[in-house]
Amino acid sequence: MSKVVVLNDKLEKAGELDLPSKYAEVNPHNLYLYVKSYLASLRANTAHTKGRSDVSGGGKKPWRQKGRGGARAGSTRTNVWVGGAVAFGPTNERNYFQKVNKKQKRLAFERALADKAAKGALFTADSLAIESGKTKDANAVIKKLGVKDVLIVKDLLDEKTLLAYRNLANCYVVDVAEVNAYLVSVFNAVIMEKSALESITKEG
């Protein structure tokens, strides 16, 4: 069974909690589909090329069909001509959206949590607030955890805590309402406030 490491006020190990066993039984393909969909949604369709119907000019046949000894040509704007159209190029009309059902999103999130817990990289603590709002204090928390990078999930994200963690490259703080399977997967460790973890497991 997947275990959540419980930390005390000093961020030292104080015990373990069990994740629901069904989390680890979720097909990992659900996680793959969600991550693929999430990354696709971040793509901006800014790349654009002109096709035959978009490029200007080329309406007149450049030379007669026969008698020159050279290849025939009907337009100076085909894709083989310099200044011509692009064949099969990207256009800004493309939609990268990939649909993932609500249930599938939930299953992907459960699997992501189970994977982190199986590696001993899912932690919980009563409070993760940085009341001073100072990056120095936030950095001390990361050092105590002893992880390369970490996702911090708050039950109610306050401005001071956000300011404290915002300038650190090796962590990302997010409200429990905004956390998703991709964020859980991409970080080496995840630490959640106890109330945030309870609300997540209660929903599942």
Swiss-Prot record:
Residues 49-75 are annotated as: Disordered. It comes from the Bacteria. GO terms for biological process: translation. The keyword Repressor does not apply. Gene3D superfamilies: 3.40.1370.10. GO terms for molecular function: rRNA binding; structural constituent of ribosome. Keywords: Ribonucleoprotein, Ribosomal protein, RNA-binding, rRNA-binding. GO terms for cellular component: ribonucleoprotein complex; ribosome. SUPFAM superfamilies: Ribosomal protein L4. Belongs to the universal ribosomal protein uL4 family. Part of the 50S ribosomal subunit. One of the primary rRNA binding proteins, this protein initially binds near the 5'-end of the 23S rRNA. It is important during the early stages of 50S assembly. It makes multiple contacts with different domains of the 23S rRNA in the assembled 50S subunit and ribosome. Forms part of the polypeptide exit tunnel. This is Large ribosomal subunit protein uL4. The gene is rplD.
